[in-house]
């Protein structure tokens, strides 16, 4: 039996206390070796050259050089998986989402107070995300932009008919996790304003959901918003669960409505993709289309299978374009995905499959 080489980690944080805590947390795992730490990006730059780490943990707010500037330079000159350590504030959410757009693989939220003691509560998450990052494909984040698609595009004909349909009868459900903030942006960026309604679940801390919805809305012709309980689901609109709550759909006569669910975590997540997908399977059946994008773990796989069994067309993002092929891979292995699609074709295929949904 061969032992796996430990993941080599460099910790970059201006707080000596945080550097010490992260070192202790990561060093407890036999699969991780902390090869060094740095108090600012300029020191980190030299240590990266010398130590060649597999993963870097990076504080967002740093002295001497802005963390985002450092990250952008790193991804351009020496692409390395990065896990951001960010604060649970509105400003922290915006900065972290920007970091993810620049190429960071994932992030861990830093407690607002008593950081040293608070980080211990995130120990399991920190370790799992660092290990996941070591396997992530950073190059998948630097992809060419897909052409914008429209409902009457003929590049992917379905049964010889144009991609036109009554959008009030169709619903698209999407789930994502690690790498998903950018993957969802790419998909929504290439959806036309008159696309079918989209309901989405992305694993995020509660305090990040508003900033994420606003960010997606700036990049899409669709109207992207946090869902409110009981609101009608309309064509041309995309809905995310509000912070730290599940999103489900319910049937109300000839339309669907959002149901905000404050129930317990599912698959250790809240919001959970499975909660959304199972409600879509039960209430929309063959009138829906399901998709799982990049993400760690297996949340959504069983729900996507239920959607397929209910008559909905399904797809997952392919491994080559995924930052982490955990959730899509789990769904594929379960037999829940009818198609495996590169990210730059997901929007096109969702529209095509919606056109043929019964």
Curated annotation (Swiss-Prot):
Its Gene Ontology cellular component terms are: cytoplasm
What family does this chain come from, according to its entry? Belongs to the CheB family.
Posttranslational modification: Phosphorylated by CheA. Phosphorylation of the N-terminal regulatory domain activates the methylesterase activity.
Name the UniProt record assigns to this protein: Protein-glutamate methylesterase/protein-glutamine glutaminase 1
Q: Where is the active site?
A: 177, 203, 299
Looking at the record, the residues that make up the CheB-type methylesterase domain are 165-352
InterPro entries according to UniProt: CheB-like, CheB_C, CheY-like_superfamily, Sig_transdc_resp-reg_Me-estase, Sig_transdc_resp-reg_receiver
Where does this protein chiefly localize? cytoplasm
The Response regulatory domain, residue ranges:
8-125
């Amino acid at each position: 039996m061969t032992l796996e080489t430990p993941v080599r980690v460099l910790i970059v944080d201006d707080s000596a206390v945080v550097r010490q805590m992260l070192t202790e947390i990561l060093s407890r795992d036999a699969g991780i070796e902390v090869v060094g730490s740095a108090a600012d990006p300029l020191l980190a730059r030299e240590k990266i050259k010398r130590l060649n780490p597999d993963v870097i943990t990076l504080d967002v707010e740093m002295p001497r050089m802005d963390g985002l500037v450092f990250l952008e330079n790193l991804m351009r000159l020496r692409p390395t998986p990065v896990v951001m350590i960010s604060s649970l504030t509105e400003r922290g959410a915006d900065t972290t989402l920007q970091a993810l757009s620049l190429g960071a693989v994932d992030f861990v939220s830093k407690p607002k107070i008593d950081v040293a003691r608070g980080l211990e509560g995130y120990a399991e998450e920190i370790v799992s995300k660092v290990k996941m990052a070591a396997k992530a494909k950073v190059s998948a984040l630097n992809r060419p932009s897909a052409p914008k698609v429209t409902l009457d595009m003929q590049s992917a004909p379905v049964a010889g008919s144009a991609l036109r349909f009554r959008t009030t009868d169709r619903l698209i459900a999407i789930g994502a996790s690690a790498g998903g903030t950018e993957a969802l942006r790419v998909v929504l960026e290439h959806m036309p304003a008159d696309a079918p309604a989209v309901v989405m679940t992305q694993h995020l801390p509660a305090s990040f959901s508003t900033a994420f919805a606003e960010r997606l809305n700036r990049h899409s012709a669709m109207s992207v918003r946090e869902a409110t309980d009981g609101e009608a689901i309309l064509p041309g609109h995309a809905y995310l669960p509000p912070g730290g709550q599940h999103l489900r759909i319910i049937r109300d006569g000839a339309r669907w409505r959002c149901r905000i669910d404050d129930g317990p975590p599912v698959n250790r997540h809240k919001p959970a993709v499975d909660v959304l997908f199972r409600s879509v399977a039960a209430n929309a059946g063959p009138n829906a289309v399901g998709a799982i994008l990049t993400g760690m773990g297996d949340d959504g796989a069983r729900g996507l299978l239920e959607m397929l069994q209910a008559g909905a067309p399904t797809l997952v993002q392919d491994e080559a374009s995924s930052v982490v092929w955990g959730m899509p891979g789990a769904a594929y292995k379960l037999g829940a995905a009818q198609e495996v699609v590169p990210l730059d074709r997901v929007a096109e295929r969702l529209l095509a499959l919606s056109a043929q949904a019964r």
